[in-house]
């Protein structure tokens, strides 16, 4: 708070992501921070326990149901108003997380100490099953589906009149925890060619 307290973008402070353990300790930290510097909103944790001292809550789910959506038919007449109706603003946590097929063309980008071994395993499995010639089709089809799902979920949260907002899991793939091909950008933060920035900004 002393180091960044005057930064104009510092409006929310959360004690951590998906914390476990003694939430009485986290709640005490929130109360101390509120007393020390009341210029921002504080929360104990994302996606775990909503404590009485929270001034906002970031989660997949509230006591009234899921905010982050992973199922349902495409439509434009649904929102998360009922699920977001609690005592503080609710921010949907890590929306997205739709996996797509890997793009094997990305393998050649790995020129440093990190090797794309996971890509090689997936490519070998596809070849072993006689489907390697379909790899690009799988990538493009699942990628288009992922882009559509991002649009559906983002727009549903924008329609949620009492929503405090949403935060994506990430715009780029995350290679730090297994294989998470969840981004519209690859792990190098480069476009996968699935959607233009202008088109994506229509819903995000």
PLM feature spans:
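Substrate-binding/catalytic cleft of secreted carbohydrate-active enzymes
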Residues: 1-185
């Amino acid at each position: 708070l002393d180091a960044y307290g005057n930064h104009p973008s510092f409006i929310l402070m959360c004690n951590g992501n998906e914390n476990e353990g003694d939430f009485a300790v986290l709640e005490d930290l929130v109360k101390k921070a509120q007393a020390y510097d009341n210029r921002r909103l504080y929360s104990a944790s994302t996606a775990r326990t909503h404590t009485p001292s929270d001034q906002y809550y970031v989660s997949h789910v509230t006591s009234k149901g899921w905010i982050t959506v992973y199922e349902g038919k495409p439509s434009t007449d649904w929102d998360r108003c009922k699920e977001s109706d609690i005592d503080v603003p609710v921010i949907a946590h890590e929306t997205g997380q739709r996996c797509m097929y890997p793009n094997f063309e990305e393998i050649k980008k790995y020129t440093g100490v990190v090797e794309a071994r996971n890509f090689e395993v997936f490519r070998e499995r596809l070849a072993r099953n006689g489907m390697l010639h379909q790899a690009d089709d799988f990538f493009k089809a699942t990628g288009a589906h992922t882009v559509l799902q991002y649009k559906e979920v983002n727009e549903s949260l924008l329609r949620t009149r009492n929503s405090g907002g949403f935060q994506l899991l990430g715009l780029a793939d995350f290679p730090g925890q297994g294989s998470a091909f969840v981004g519209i950008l690859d792990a190098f933060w480069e476009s996968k060619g699935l959607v233009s920035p202008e088109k994506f900004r229509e819903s995000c």
